[in-house]
A protein has these predicted regions:
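Catalytic pocket-lining loop regions of alpha/beta-barrel enzymes
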Residues: 119-172
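Mid-domain alpha/beta scaffold segments of enzyme catalytic cores
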Residues: 2-133, 144
Length: 172
């Protein structure tokens, strides 16, 4: 994507999901949708609220199968960007191809999983590639675990986004 902004930016929705309930869902998921969230409906939603652009985030129930969202990006490449979910062993070339399709970062959905060790070799390689591409890392984890994860991420120089406000307690 050589010209990321042919549409004037009036406002950006920084987190949305699009999907079809008929897609192949990942095993071990916490949620299974019983409805469709289409790109057309999302673009209409942006218009209704005076927003010109959006960032689509790979939903956890689709795992690392990013094909649906690549198709979604193709429907409005001048208005949409996307976060991919990837395996730690993904190649630099695969990430570069994703960048060409409008990917601007990776989402680490760590809810319900053991805390990763971001100093492990496979993570180091991934974060080096993310930094090289100028992408950001979106962390989806409970707020109590975020300081330790962020401390591990900072040396890589990647921009960090906290997903869902760090999932604070509902009483807040």
């Amino acid at each position: 994507m050589t010209d990321p902004c042919t549409t004037p930016i009036l406002g950006i929705d920084a987190h949305a999901h699009v999907f079809s309930k008929d897609l192949s869902l990942t095993s071990g998921r916490r949620y299974s949708p019983d409805y469709d969230a289409t790109v057309q409906a999302y673009l209409a939603h942006l218009h209704e609220h005076g927003l010109s652009h959006g960032v689509l985030v790979q939903p956890s129930f689709l795992g690392t199968d990013n094909r649906f969202l690549f198709d979604a990006l193709a429907q409005a490449p001048d208005r949409l960007r996307r976060l991919a979910v990837v395996d730690t062993d993904i190649s630099r070339g695969a990430l570069q191809r994703m960048a060409g399709l409008g990917i601007v970062g990776i989402r680490l959905n760590l809810i319900g999983r053991a805390l990763p060790d971001f100093t492990a070799p496979e993570w180091k390689s991934l974060f080096k590639n993310v930094w090289t591409l100028g992408w950001h890392v979106e962390l989806h984890r409970e707020v109590a675990d975020l300081p330790g994860l962020i401390r591990q991420l900072l040396p890589f120089g990647c921009k960090i986004v906290i997903d869902h406000f760090g999932r604070p307690a509902s009483r807040l």
